[in-house]
């Protein structure tokens, strides 16, 4: 996936990577991920193994509209679910696993993954989560760093919108995104610093690798980072979405934010930015409270409810999107506010039925919608 960079938000290309759990009908993790990748990889472009054997990652090609992205995401999910069904397994679209497991997830055999397990020890046993990563084309790395400085302020709102992991290991965590809390255990994870230049970005990456906090550039787990293999900026804050429609909506929001940032740079607009420690604190709040929380608004420079900030976010990103994407964004946000985020839908199903098995059933049905 290598979305090409262009100059306006409506023309920006976008691609999405999604991680999924493989589970049996009871919701327990399956170690068959590498086998499913081997069997289905020739039919499903972009299928990849992950750190844990219970996970699989998909990647779209280059897309330009929300509708195009939705169709490709839905097709990838359906084909992968069919491949999993060939082994009597299900695709679980949740940021965290739901039921109690007896042992930590098994690591996929590979020299890199085995070295990660040795280097980071028990952290590796406790960070098995599934996320959604959105790539948007940018003109250059210098511009990408400046875009990151603007986009980072919106990370709490993005996290609240994308939250889909309220349950883990058999209980309600009291968070909307427990995945965010788990993932934060990596020493290289968190909001990106505010950088003055691409040179400063590269120096910081080198220093983190030098300390051992990251083994290599692929382990720079900032929530916004510059991709190394394609000319894109990558936003990594989201839980994997319950539905393809929600994943596509989130990707359009990210695309629109990058377009807004590029236009803001052209216009000389400055946006107040939070220090990393304050942004980290606001991300914790967003992970806990979801859309019911509040944080400092980049658009208003004061604390506002996140639901109100969704309106401000829409005001920022919509002008840079084409007509079809504006309609896709408006419809998608209306649906989320009416039906709930993934986390809200998971909790509602548990409240209605009273079992995590019912939540697993909901997730494995909705994954292909």
Swiss-Prot record:
Does Ligase count among this protein's keywords?
Answer: yes
GO terms of biological process kind: modified amino acid biosynthetic process
Q: Which domain of life is it from?
A: Bacteria
Q: What Pfam families has UniProt attached to this entry?
A: GCS2
InterPro entries reported in the protein's UniProt record: GCL_type2/YbdK_subfam (IPR050141), GCS2 (IPR006336), Gln_synth/guanido_kin_cat_dom (IPR014746), YbdK (IPR011793)
Q: What class of enzyme is it?
A: ligase
**Which Gene Ontology terms cover its molecular function?**
ATP binding; glutamate-cysteine ligase activity
Instruction: Write down the EC number.
Output: 6.3.2.2
Reaction equation(s) it catalyzes: L-cysteine + L-glutamate + ATP = gamma-L-glutamyl-L-cysteine + ADP + phosphate + H(+)
Q: Which UniProt keywords apply?
A: ATP-binding, Ligase, Nucleotide-binding
Quick check: keyword Nucleotide-binding in the entry?
Answer: yes
Q: Which HAMAP family match?
A: Glu_cys_ligase_2
Function summary: ATP-dependent carboxylate-amine ligase which exhibits weak glutamate--cysteine ligase activity.
Tell me which NCBIfam families the record gives.
gshA_cyan_rel, PRK13517.1-1
> What does the sequence similarity comment in the record state about its family?
Belongs to the glutamate--cysteine ligase type 2 family. YbdK subfamily.
Could you tell me what this protein is called?
Putative glutamate--cysteine ligase 2-1
Task: State the organism named in the record.
Answer: Rhodococcus jostii (strain RHA1)
